[in-house]
A protein has these predicted regions:
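Basic, low-complexity terminal or inter-domain segments flanking catalytic cores
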Residues: 47, 125-126, 147-535
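C-terminal accessory/connector segments of nucleic-acid motor ATPases
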Residues: 48-65, 91-131, 321, 341
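Phosphate-backbone binding and catalysis cores of DNA-processing enzymes
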Residues: 1-99, 193-249, 254, 258
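Secretory-pathway/luminal and periplasmic proteins that interact with or process carbohydrate-rich
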Residues: 138-144
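Positively charged, polyanion-binding regions of nucleic-acid-associated proteins
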Residues: 87-103, 306-315
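Conserved short loop/turn motifs at secondary-structure junctions
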Residues: 21-24, 97-106, 115-121, 144-152, ...
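Short amphipathic alpha-helical face segments that pack within enzyme cores
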Residues: 33-34, 112, 130, 219, ...
Length: 535
């Protein structure tokens, strides 16, 4: 009733006050803070001013070492450090190895499945929900609208039978045959399961699936098999070195026993990622560096090296994608300062797994946001709506935190439900009077379908401009005693992922899928010739 009271009154209020030409300005406890996340991120990007910095590195024995000092904020400081190490020998000061284990990724709940499908296949949250719902209705996977990544203990005796029924995965299931399946607390924990457990296969043989359904089923199947495999064992090597007083470092990672990673070894795409925000490009580079295998170094060895001082530029935050937005909604407590409210949001964030896809789709339908490749871009309508909302609480995740806390207090009989409703009515009344006191004639811009089409056409020219800008502002290297190799400028073919999953216009049977350089039809094996190259 709380969502209805707030949404019904606030939507009518803002529509009548600031809408135009039958435009509906919908307001909601989850919808509006979600839009605010996108708008605020976009404003951060628009106002971002890149700043130069310099990184000192050197190549010793075909291995790139980076100065441990990090970034130099002035070129003079970097050149001074460069001059210190020029023509001086590089010495290895320490070599350390540390073995570690990497546990299999957790089973899927709905949000993590939507995140993975968006990251890997560019499927929207709504599209993934529809696909997994289809698999569930065909009894191939379990109930999908779940918010847990655990199984209850009573599922354990059924797991061997489920694995046996999974056709097409025999090469991965065979090593588990005849053995007692491990029962890990990372997988089986009844205390963390409410009405439904994590999404897993049912053991019913999967046949006659579309390509998109097969992709989703394959993610679930491999994840289920992987949890019964041993940990991946690896060794991390860290090598420290110095030239004069300047210290350098490089790290490498060697897989000793792949364990569960065997399940993903033949896939061209990357193995599952941890549940964390999308890393920046520099973090991506660091991750790739750490995963490389290093040559053998010995403490005390020394020799010539090739130093490089590289100019780089700070980069703006990344636009939200559906994957990162879903994670932000799930972990919305991090946007709240009040510790009590943050704790209330910790368990569920804003929205429920089953409703988040619908919330995002509503933002699209209202023309508050649009897609640009994978990125979510706020339209003029979305930006102006957030700017015009008077009550900051309506735009904040704190509102959900306040409600969650009060609902828990009601559950523990510390607070009366009637008081909650009365307070909510009072809050809505204050919101109404606050807006009515605005004597301006402001109106929120209407973003039409034609506006979205123009934006789509405009961005097709963007890759060329971006490439030119990138070439003009690319990192420059200042080297002495050695010339740096120029890096060729590259650009990816641009793509419009919004057509993925739509019905093929040629055969009418398949759906549009995304390849490396073009879109095609999932029915291509049966002769459909539909193909559209990326622009």
């Amino acid at each position: 009733i709380g969502d209805w009271l707030l949404g019904m009154n606030a939507t009518r209020l803002y529509t009548l006050k600031y809408g135009q030409n039958r435009q509906v300005l919908s307001i909601g406890r989850v919808q509006t803070p979600t839009l605010a996340l996108i708008v605020n991120r976009q404003k951060e990007i628009d106002s971002f001013e890149p700043e130069p910095y310099w990184v000192l590195s050197t190549i010793y024995r075909d291995t790139l070492f980076t100065a441990t000092k990090g970034k130099f904020t002035t070129k003079e400081e970097g050149e001074q450090a460069f001059a210190t190490i020029a023509d001086k020998p590089f010495e290895v000061t320490n070599v350390s190895k540390k073995n570690g284990n990497e546990a299999p990724p957790r089973l899927f709940d709905l949000t993590s499945l939507q995140v993975e499908c968006n990251r890997k296949f560019s499927y929207s949250a709504e599209m993934t929900l529809n696909l997994i719902q289809s698999l569930y209705e065909r009894k191939l996977t379990t109930y999908p609208r779940v918010d847990t990544q655990f199984l209850s203990d009573d599922i354990y005796p059924k797991c061997a039978g489920i694995l046996t029924g999974m056709r097409g995965y025999e090469q991965y299931i065979q090593p588990l045959a005849g053995k007692k399946l491990p029962k890990s607390k990372r997988v089986f924990d009844t205390s963390k399961v409410t009405d439904h457990h994590a999404i897993i296969p049912t053991g019913v043989p999967a046949s006659a699936l579309s390509d998109m359904e097969r992709n989703v089923y394959d993610l679930i199947a491999r994840r289920f098999i992987a949890v019964f495999y041993p940990d991946c064992k690896f060794s991390t090597t860290t090598v420290l070195g110095k030239v004069e007083d300047v210290e350098f470092k490089v790290s490498g990672k060697e897989i000793l026993e792949p364990g569960w990673r065997t399940i993903y070894a033949q896939q061209q795409t990357s193995t599952p990622q941890p549940n964390n925000p999308q890393p920046s490009s520099s973090e991506d580079d660091d991750k790739r560096d750490e995963e490389r295998t290093l040559p053998t170094f010995v403490k005390g060895e020394s020799g010539p090296h090739t130093p490089t001082l590289t100019e780089k530029w700070t980069t703006p935050p990344k636009y939200y994608t559906e994957a990162t937005l879903l994670r932000a909604m799930e972990t919305a407590g991090k946007f709240v300062d009040d510790e009590t409210l943050r704790a209330a949001l910790k368990e569920n964030g804003i929205g429920r797994p089953s409703s988040r896809a619908g919330i995002i789709e509503t933002l699209f339908k209202r023309h508050y946001i649009r897609r640009e490749r994978k990125n979510l871009i706020a339209t003029a309508t979305g930006i102006e709506l957030i700017d015009i909302i008077h009550e900051e609480l309506l735009k904040s995740c704190e509102l959900t935190g306040i409600w969650e806390k009060k609902l828990r207090d009601i559950e523990h009989k510390k607070y009366e439900a009637a008081d909650f409703i009365n307070e909510l009515k009072q809050q809505v009344t204050e919101i109404v009077y606050d807006v009515l006191r605005d004597n301006s004639n402001r109106r929120v811009t209407i973003t039409t379908d034609e506006d979205l089409k123009k934006a789509k056409k405009k961005k097709t020219a963007a890759p060329k401009k971006a490439a030119a800008k990138s070439a003009a502002t690319s990192s420059t290297a200042s080297t002495k005693n050695a010339a740096a190799s120029p890096q060729p400028a590259t650009s990816e073919p641009s793509a419009d992922d919004s057509i993925i999953g739509t019905t093929c216009p040629v055969c009418g049977k398949g759906t549009i899928i995304k390849g490396k350089t073009a879109y095609g039809c999932s029915n291509w094996k049966n002769g459909c010739t539909y193909r559209v190259a990326f622009k």
